[in-house]
Regions:
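Short, small-residue-biased leader/transition segments that mark boundaries at the very start
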Residues: 2-6
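Carbohydrate-binding surface patches
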Residues: 412-455
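Aromatic-lined carbohydrate-binding/catalytic grooves of carbohydrate-active enzymes
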Residues: 94-231, 244
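Conserved, mostly hydrophobic/aromatic
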Residues: 57, 103, 133, 171, ...
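Catalytic cores of secreted or luminal carbohydrate-active enzymes
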Residues: 360-409
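Active-site neighborhood of glycoside hydrolase catalytic domains
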Residues: 161-163, 195-197, 201-358, 370, ...
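C-terminal beta-sandwich/jelly-roll accessory domains of carbohydrate-active enzymes
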Residues: 439-499
Length: 499
């Protein structure tokens, strides 16, 4: 080719500028170069359907953006974002506190559960070292499927064989914490709430509303809607002594029409919706200051720094396939700290893709995040139960390293037949490197990967073969696996400072 080399920055070289919007609504990010060869960048509220009316003396606060620069590539840029979000965006009781390893019942039962099933899942999980049981969708109202019940935040005591406080007490007596799923911003047309307050839902008069997951969106711009939700959520959390809440949002916002807003202010509704969500979250967390809140939006649909101000971890994707998660978590790492990445070991064949992945690999991928399980542990083999114990122990051993350490992407997405990443302690005393083989080929060559971030003049022992080398040698020579990894197999390698 005769064209000039592309001025592309890499992980460890080149100038990089990042912009991260602290906002959870409609947004635009655009870059353009003018006739004087100057680049102009914009980021903020999307102008489509946005018009905010200000009276004399009123002010409007625009969303903030976090800007960062690195002269040494994308890795440094990401590490700077990880630090600022972890230290200056995330807050609350779990900003730095160790978060419990959880098991969620969703992929184990979906809507088909009762108290007995949930307690059996909890009992087995507790035996294997898991610290919290999270009860997902289906515990409230007449919610036997996704066609009804949203908005009726009252415990279905017939289904649960008693109150939520009774179930929570049984879980707590096992020595486990207990969490609940909510989807506060949504409403089912087949619900007592909708029958009582149809005007609380976004819907354009005279039109059939757009449904997604068989539900509508509540008008979060309304104070009466937020007051109802705040009373229901705080009552349940306080009565049952709930330790954790998963705050879900399983559809996008459309049909934006409020029955109480003036017609000339319809252009404010999308933005006021976001402000209403923030207001509810702020008051909810003020009423429940010891709560761990995990955000979710069909997975990562609202995975942003605005939500991280309220939830220090967000369910990264409803796709729990370990191989798909490699690219999902890779992309998330460019801006967001690994401590914010909700990641679980799920059942195989995977419920989203049908793929069969080794249990060990599923654990290694989930360790690059908050870590938990999404399955019925009573239905796995004894060998897999031993792996659960090992994975739980590994999470405790490496928790500070994965949640507070420096993160390195060692591979891209398409350049090789494996993916690798590394965590390095801030004092450079240890590092954890993980490799996952993504493609098998005939006559496979040994995997060779970079090693990054070790102190140049310190000696490090590699757990793979106990070889000791200077950090500068590992950093330059990298690591070669002499054992052959099969497709979807993984390995963890630790480097420990020799003192």
């Amino acid at each position: 080719s005769l064209h000039d080399a592309l001025p592309i920055s890499g992980e460890t070289h080149g100038s990089c500028i990042g912009a991260c919007l602290v906002y959870s609504g409609n947004f635009v990010a655009a870059a353009q170069k003018d006739q004087k060869n100057q680049t102009r960048f914009q980021m903020g509220i999307h102008p489509t359907n946005f018009c905010f009316h200000l009276e004399k003396g009123e002010a409007f606060d625009t969303p903030q953006a976090i800007l960062s620069y690195s002269g040494t590539g994308l890795t440094k840029l990401s590490q700077q974002y990880h630090e600022i979000i972890r230290e200056h965006i995330c807050r609350g009781a779990y900003k730095h506190a160790k978060r419990p390893i959880l098991i969620n019942n969703w992929e184990a039962t979906y809507f088909d559960f009762n108290e007995e099933k949930i307690l059996k899942i909890a009992e087995q999980a507790q035996k294997l070292g898991i610290e919290m049981l999270v009860l997902d969708d289906g515990w409230f109202g007449k919610r036997e499927d996704d066609n009804s019940g949203l908005g009726d935040w009252f415990v279905n005591e017939k289904k649960m064989n008693g109150s939520m406080a009774q179930l929570a007490e049984k879980i707590h007596r096992m020595g486990m914490k207990f969490g609940l799923w909510f989807e506060p911003e949504m409403i089912s047309e087949d619900s007592d709430l909708y029958r009582a307050h149809p005007d609380w839902a976004f819907a354009i008069p005279g039109r059939v509303p757009n449904h997604s997951r068989n539900q509508l969106v509540l008008d979060m711009t309304r104070e009466d809607v937020r007051e109802y939700l705040l009373e229901r959520l705080t009552t349940i959390v306080h009565d049952a002594k709930i330790d954790y809440v998963k705050w879900d949002m399983n559809r996008s916002v459309c049909d934006v029409y409020s029955h109480v807003a003036a017609q000339n202010r319809n252009g404010e509704l999308y933005h006021r919706y976001v402000l209403g969500v923030y207001d509810l979250l702020e008051r909810f967390l003020a009423a429940c200051p010891d709560l761990l809140l995990e955000g979710c939006s069909g997975g990562g649909g609202r995975y942003d720094a605005g939500m991280m101000y309220y939830s220090p971890q967000i369910w990264c994707s409803d796709n729990t396939d370990a191989i798909n998660r490699l690219s999902i978590q890779y992309g998330s790492s460019f801006f967001y700290p690994i401590s914010t990445v909700g990641s679980h070991v799920s059942v195989c064949p995977n419920h989203q893709t049908g793929r069969v992945t080794p249990f060990r690999t599923r654990g290694d991928v989930a360790l690059a995040g908050s870590f938990g399980y999404e399955m019925d542990l009573n239905k796995i083999s004894e060998e897999e139960k031993e792996m659960v114990k090992e994975q739980v122990a590994a999470m405790h051993e490496y928790y500070e390293l994965t949640h507070e350490g420096l993160y390195y992407r060692l591979t891209g997405l398409k350049k090789q037949d494996f993916m690798a990443w590394e965590f390095v302690a801030k004092d450079q005393s240890r590092a954890l490197l993980t490799i996952v083989k993504t493609d098998a080929e005939g006559n496979m060559l040994p995997v060779h990967t970079k090693v990054c971030g070790l102190a140049e003049d310190k000696l490090y022992r590699c757990s793979l073969d106990q070889e000791v080398r200077l950090g500068r040698t590992w950093n330059r020579a990298g690591l070669t696996l002499h054992q052959v990894l099969g497709e979807y197999e993984s390995i963890r390698v630790e480097f420990t400072e020799v003192k």
